[in-house]
């Protein structure tokens, strides 16, 4: 995507009237490599001008915000480093196809003896771009078609239309994205969408039509998102054999909710990390901004990763959540938590743990799940340093529970109920990392603590997705 170029690495004199008259004699000055490196690192320079070649519809103010640190560089090494950082910021805006950097001595009447010019050669994206790709969700694959209008108003705004057709879900949506100049992490977006999903474990079909507005911003080492969402939900039965409990949930509802999400992520990879930690906390309040659905919902996700000897990695994760209905109306099957499957408690079928009626799983209002994992290289290290590095041997122990609580009881009763009838499983398998997109797991699972009504997958189980317990 481009490189940083320096026209000359010869030492730059800091003063002297003969700077412009050295002529060709400078080509014959020999400098020892060690001394030359020392001079480059310590030589004081001044960035006098920053030029842009290739700008069209991009506004100057957003560019100035991204390259301002280049002027603060005090030596050539700093100039190269800050120019590279500025290049990465420009690419992150998503409005350039390519960005190259050229560093040269300053030219012109106002040139200082130690002055430098930095030139960014950019290629803007076309006004309309299209894309076609496949995407892997949690045990679901989909085909995605997209149209994008990048840099719509010249300040990195983006309008995107996306259509997705998957094995269980079909959706299309229109979104507008606007970053804050000079601080890409602070951004605002508006979305219009329609999503139709099938949930065979509940014999349920759900169609959502809605809109949302969200604002994302960082605070210290945390990322926050504040969101409002209004959605018209239509629930129906997926088959004639759906239970009465599911049929009773069928119909229309309107949900208007405010939510907040906080993320702290120090992992080196989101797909198969070797080190670092993750903490996600989500809160949602529905009903106070309209609609006929009212509840408070809290859930969190914690993950710790530690690299061990022999290139092994130990990972521990813990999930939990609680849904409290507000008023006399019970919670909806569309808002409850679900547990079980190759991406959560392995050895059980997808979302097939907890309350159920006539074989249809209804979800629960409280849950917890934990996992311990050991990832090691493949035995005898086939393909070491190449394709074989994408595979890892996987040993795991999972446990958890999903239930409904009587909120008239105290916290001790809630904890006691969550500690009853714990489902757990153990096993081993192979993990394949698909770049930074998704991961595949093929495990041999032994489910334990099975309760009446649970649906198990005893033996080989395949999982694909981006979020795993």
Curated annotation (Swiss-Prot):
<feature type="region of interest" description="Disordered">
    <location>
        <begin position="1"/>
        <end position="20"/>
    </location>
</feature>
<comment type="function">
    <text>Plays a crucial role in the maintenance of the structure of mitochondrial cristae and the proper assembly of the mitochondrial respiratory chain complexes. Required for the assembly of TOMM40 into the TOM complex.</text>
</comment>
<keyword id="KW-0963">Cytoplasm</keyword>
<comment type="similarity">
    <text>Belongs to the SAM50/omp85 family.</text>
</comment>
<dbReference type="GO" id="GO:0030150">
    <property type="term" value="P:protein import into mitochondrial matrix"/>
</dbReference>
<dbReference type="GO" id="GO:0042407">
    <property type="term" value="P:cristae formation"/>
</dbReference>
<comment type="subunit">
    <text>Associates with the mitochondrial contact site and cristae organizing system (MICOS) complex, composed of at least MICOS10/MIC10, CHCHD3/MIC19, CHCHD6/MIC25, APOOL/MIC27, IMMT/MIC60, APOO/MIC23/MIC26 and QIL1/MIC13. This complex was also known under the names MINOS or MitOS complex. The MICOS complex associates with mitochondrial outer membrane proteins SAMM50, MTX1 and MTX2 (together described as components of the mitochondrial outer membrane sorting assembly machinery (SAM) complex) and DNAJC11, mitochondrial inner membrane protein TMEM11 and with HSPA9.</text>
</comment>
<keyword id="KW-1134">Transmembrane beta strand</keyword>
<keyword id="KW-0488">Methylation</keyword>
<dbReference type="GO" id="GO:0001401">
    <property type="term" value="C:SAM complex"/>
</dbReference>
<dbReference type="GO" id="GO:0033108">
    <property type="term" value="P:mitochondrial respiratory chain complex assembly"/>
</dbReference>
<keyword id="KW-0472">Membrane</keyword>
<dbReference type="GO" id="GO:0005741">
    <property type="term" value="C:mitochondrial outer membrane"/>
</dbReference>
<protein>
    <recommendedName>
        <fullName>Sorting and assembly machinery component 50 homolog</fullName>
    </recommendedName>
</protein>
<dbReference type="Pfam" id="PF01103">
    <property type="entry name" value="Omp85"/>
</dbReference>
<dbReference type="GO" id="GO:0140275">
    <property type="term" value="C:MIB complex"/>
</dbReference>
<dbReference type="InterPro" id="IPR000184">
    <property type="entry name" value="Bac_surfAg_D15"/>
</dbReference>
<feature type="domain" description="POTRA">
    <location>
        <begin position="45"/>
        <end position="125"/>
    </location>
</feature>
<keyword id="KW-0812">Transmembrane</keyword>
<dbReference type="InterPro" id="IPR034746">
    <property type="entry name" value="POTRA"/>
</dbReference>
<comment type="subunit">
    <text>(Microbial infection) Interacts with parasite T.gondii RH strain MAF1b1; the interaction is probably indirect and results in the disruption of the MIB complex and the formation of SPOTs (structures positive for outer mitochondrial membrane (OMM)), a cellular response to OMM stress, which leads to the constitutive shedding of OMM vesicles.</text>
</comment>
<keyword id="KW-1000">Mitochondrion outer membrane</keyword>
<dbReference type="GO" id="GO:0045040">
    <property type="term" value="P:protein insertion into mitochondrial outer membrane"/>
</dbReference>
<dbReference type="InterPro" id="IPR039910">
    <property type="entry name" value="D15-like"/>
</dbReference>
<dbReference type="GO" id="GO:0070062">
    <property type="term" value="C:extracellular exosome"/>
</dbReference>
<dbReference type="GO" id="GO:0007007">
    <property type="term" value="P:inner mitochondrial membrane organization"/>
</dbReference>
<feature type="modified residue" description="N6-methyllysine">
    <location>
        <position position="255"/>
    </location>
</feature>
<dbReference type="GO" id="GO:0016020">
    <property type="term" value="C:membrane"/>
</dbReference>
<keyword id="KW-0496">Mitochondrion</keyword>
<dbReference type="GO" id="GO:0005739">
    <property type="term" value="C:mitochondrion"/>
</dbReference>
């Amino acid at each position: 995507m481009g490189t940083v170029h320096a026209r000359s690495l010869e030492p730059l004199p800091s003063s002297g009237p003969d700077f412009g008259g050295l002529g060709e004699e400078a080509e014959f000055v020999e400098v020892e490599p060690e001394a030359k490196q020392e001079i480059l690192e310590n030589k004081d320079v001044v960035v006098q001008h920053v030029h842009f070649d290739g700008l069209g519809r991009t506004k100057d103010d957003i560019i100035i915000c991204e390259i301002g640190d280049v002027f603060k560089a005090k030596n050539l090494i700093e100039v190269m480093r800050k120019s590279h950082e500025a290049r990465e910021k420009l690419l992150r805006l998503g409005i350039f196809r390519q960005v190259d950097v050229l560093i040269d001595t300053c030219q012109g009447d106002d040139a200082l003896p130690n002055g430098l010019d930095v030139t960014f050669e950019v290629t803007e994206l076309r006004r309309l771009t299209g894309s076609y790709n496949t995407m892997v969700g949690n045990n679901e694959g989909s085909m995605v078609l997209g149209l994008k209008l990048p840099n719509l108003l010249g300040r990195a705004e983006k309008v995107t239309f996306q259509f997705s057709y998957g094995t269980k879900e079909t959706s299309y949506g229109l979104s507008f994205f606007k970053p804050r100049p000079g601080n890409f992490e602070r951004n605002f977006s508006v979305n219009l969408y329609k999503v139709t999903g099938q949930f065979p474990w509940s014999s349920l079909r759900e169609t959502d039509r809605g809109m949302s507005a969200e604002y994302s911003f960082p605070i210290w080492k945390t990322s926050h998102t504040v969101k409002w969402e209004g959605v018209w939900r239509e629930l129906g039965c997926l088959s004639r054999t759906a239970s009465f409990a599911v049929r009773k949930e069928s119909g229309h509802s309107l949900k208007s909710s405010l939510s907040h999400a906080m993320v702290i992520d120090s992992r080196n990879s989101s797909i198969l990390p070797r080190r670092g930690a993750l903490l996600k906390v989500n809160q949602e309040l529905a009903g106070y901004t309209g609609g006929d659905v009212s509840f408070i919902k809290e859930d969190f996700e914690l993950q710790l990763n530690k690299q061990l000897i022999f290139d092994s990695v130990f990972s521990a994760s813990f999930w939990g959540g609680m849904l409290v209905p507000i008023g006399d109306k019970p919670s909806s099957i569309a808002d409850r938590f679900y547990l079980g499957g190759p991406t959560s408690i392995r050895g059980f079928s997808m979302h097939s743990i907890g309350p159920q009626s006539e074989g249809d799983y209804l979800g629960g209002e409280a849950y917890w799940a934990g996992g311990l994992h050991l990832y090691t290289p493949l035995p005898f290290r086939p393909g070491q340093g190449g394709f074989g590095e994408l595979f890892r041997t996987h040993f795991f122990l999972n446990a958890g529970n999903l239930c409904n609580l009587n909120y008239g009881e105290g916290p001790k009763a809630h904890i006691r109920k969550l500690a009853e009838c714990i489902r757990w499983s153990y096993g081993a398998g192979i993990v394949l990392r698909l770049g930074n997109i998704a991961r595949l797991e093929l495990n041999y699972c032994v489910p334990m603590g099975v309760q009446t009504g649970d649906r198990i997958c005893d033996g080989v189980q395949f999982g694909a997705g981006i979020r795993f317990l």
